[in-house]
From Swiss-Prot:
The record marks A463 as: Important for potassium dependence. It comes from Methanosarcina mazei (strain ATCC BAA-159 / DSM 3647 / Goe1 / Go1 / JCM 11833 / OCM 88) (Methanosarcina frisia). This is K(+)-stimulated pyrophosphate-energized sodium pump. It comes from the Archaea. Homodimer. Mg(2+) 2 binds at N218, D221, D433. Mg(2+) 1 binds at D191, D195. It catalyses: Na(+)(in) + diphosphate + H2O = Na(+)(out) + 2 phosphate + H(+). NCBIfam families: PRK00733.3-5, V_PPase. Requires K(+) for maximal activity. Inhibited by the Na(+) ionophore monensin, activated by the K(+) ionophore valinomycin and unaffected by the protonophore CCCP. Belongs to the H(+)-translocating pyrophosphatase (TC 3.A.10) family. K(+)-stimulated subfamily. Coiled coil: none annotated. Optimum pH is 7.5.
Amino acid sequence: MDMLIYLTPICALIGLIFAGISYKNVRNEGEGNELIKKITAAIHGGAMVYLNRQYRAIAVFVVFIAIVLALVLPNGVLTAACFVFGAVLSATAGYAGMLTATIANGRTTNAATRGIGPAFKVSFASGTVMGMSVVGLGLFGLSLSFIILGNIYTDMDLFTLLNIIAGFSFGASSIALFARVGGGIFTKAADVGADLVGKVEAGIPEDDPRNPAVIADNVGDNVGDIAGMGADLYESYVGSIIATMLLAASTAAATFPGIPVMNVVMVPLVIAAVGILASVIGTFFVRTNKTESSAIHMAFNMGLIAAIVLTVIASYVVTGHLLGGYGLNVFFSTVAGLVAGFLIGQITEHYTSYDKKPTLTVAHSCQTGSATNVITGFAKGMESTLWPAVIISIAIYIAFQLAGLYGIAIAAVGMLATLGISLSVDAYGPVADNAGGIAEMSHQKKEVRQITDTLDAVGNTTAAMGKGFAIGSAALTALSLFASYAIAVGLTSIDVMNPNVFIGLIIGAMLPFLFSSMTILAVGNAAGEVVVEVRRQFKEIKGLMEGKADPDYSKCITISTHSALKEMIPPGILAVIAPILVGLVLGAGALGGLLAGSVVSGFMLAITMSNAGGSWDNAKKFIELGNFGGKGSDAHKAGVTGDTVGDPFKDTAGPAINILIKLMSIVALVFAPLFI
């Protein structure tokens, strides 16, 4: 085994050390006054209670699947061990990110009393813990599994060895599914419940401490957008690397004649390793003391561009060193993925930002009522699929022409190589959002709230861009895993003239819609319970509306937690059982059709829902700035309705589809021996 392979866990450890330093920096910040401490403790306590209960529930699933893997697969015990290892590290990353975010929010509010610079520093440092934990633990676990098993089982076929290690990605996918679905149900149940009764019925502002669901809403921001987003991208990161390694083992001899197969296998690991170093360096470019949101955007872009440029340079050196004359083709495939990821983020921003035409059109439609708002927003969401589809298609075409199926997979690795910093930027948003809520609830000065509002506005944009990036990376990762599955079962093409294959295609195209239905209905049911509870408290607690009595915040947290844990099980079972049943009943070709159908329909549906939801959200915010009558106007009420409809679209169903298409692909790959 080439000594260069040992670089990967070392770079991963550097990322983890940097995450530890960032955590220490957050802890060293002042906690604020007693009221800030009290609110922070309530949010932190609610988030950690939910996360602990969720992980206990997932542990049962993980143990059950591990036993099944050990019993039914060749090399099942090794696959089960990798599965558990991947699940544990994914859960650890989520725990680290959640722990940090829920102690950073109050500290960000307190830092905002000293100016935007200190507040920005604290919130971004918190995001950095999540970003670096995900890439550090993901690459460390994957490379360690490869090194240990490779050194022990020296006589094992390389493709077989890597198929065992694919269990690591399956473990990551399992955690991701429940974290995304459960977290999405929790956050939107609380959010919708708080908005419907608080804003629409009671007429009180957002983050008002009189609202019984306000703490649950803030807890949900962390549960969904920190732990959920982190697990989603951890899964894509790990899945893209293992898919590329599998394709290298199976196609290297034909695609790169004369190059040692191990060199081709190592390329994704080494690119991921240098991507971590580039991300760490990129964080030092994220600095600003200016109060304009454009300056904060510029600071983030400087960091992202620095990381991308460094990764491009390093990838050129790595591919040239490992692949010789073929290095340039693989290098340009990597760059195609990097550029595609960046462009999809920009397209998402265009469709969801309130200073761009699509969202302004949605905001304008609010003047004629809720119905026209919903119609226009949904239409714009569907329209927004055009350019991401074109961009992904061009990236796939370029990568395939340059390096075959391996090129497509390495494009996914390229897209995710700078995940360390891009996820840090995404994870900053919920902290800034919480800080604004805490500022409101702790009655801070207007200047402090303006600072947190500025940080939050930037966070909304970065979150929308992050969702677009997550969808694009999920599509490429799922396609790479699908290609690995096809090789594992000996499929050379998907013959749609074969009835079984066409049946699989139809079932696959249907599954994202059924899955979305289940998650959206779950949000509706859970939100209904929260609404009933909030109404009860406003009615029964005397003096609550006047601010003379405190609401029972814990009740709404308990309802949201119970609903999320109960409702996340059926979608999770569907995602695992569907590909296994189709493979066993209709055969490997039909399962190939299912995977192809789910990737195509899932990609389009996820973009539609995420961008429609983001557009409705920011159309409402545009009206709240004083446009079309401002807060309390009929246009604002229509905007709130659109935002409420969009909440489960953009924060529950849309993001969860990413995991569905990846999880079904990895399930098919891991269980491939059963379908041959």
